[in-house]
């Protein structure tokens, strides 16, 4: 699960899987506000020829008419729940904005039965996050 530039650590995982010949079942969900936020979409699609066992689900939350987006829409962490409502027996690697990572962790463990110890995350803090008032 990647949101925006949180794809960078996920890309490293994909490269490792390819290098080591790992073919275990995995699905890549990558979300952005606009299609241009999926800045390495072409690279991902090229890798799919080498990793045919890896489904790729790009999800856009705020596409504009001029984007001509015809793919999945909504929040990327919600797309996972729609496709995989039971995550027991799975592992999740989530990277991106804290709100996405935190929302995914909460939903997957509370609703989709993901064991908390199977949720691995690397969230990044933006300038906007740094200026928020702590609750």
Go through each PLM region and give its residues:
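Short, glycine-rich nucleotide/cofactor-binding loops
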Residues: 1-7
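Reductase modules of NAD(P)H-dependent flavoproteins
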Residues: 24-135
């Amino acid at each position: 699960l990647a949101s925006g530039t949180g794809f960078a650590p996920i890309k490293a995982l994909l490269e490792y899987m390819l290098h080591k010949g790992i073919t275990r079942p995995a699905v890549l969900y990558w979300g952005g506000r606009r299609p241009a936020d999926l800045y390495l979409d072409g690279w991902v699609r090229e890798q799919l020829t080498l990793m045919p066992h890896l489904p790729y689900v790009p999800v856009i939350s705020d596409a504009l008419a001029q984007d001509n987006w015809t793919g999945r829409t909504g929040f990327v962490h919600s797309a996972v729940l729609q496709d995989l409502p039971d995550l027991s027996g799975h592992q999740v690697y989530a990277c991106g904005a804290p709100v996405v990572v935190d929302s995914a962790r909460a939903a997957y463990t509370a609703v989709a039965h993901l064991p908390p110890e199977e949720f691995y995350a690397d969230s990044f803090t933006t300038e906007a996050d740094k200026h928020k008032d702590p609750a």
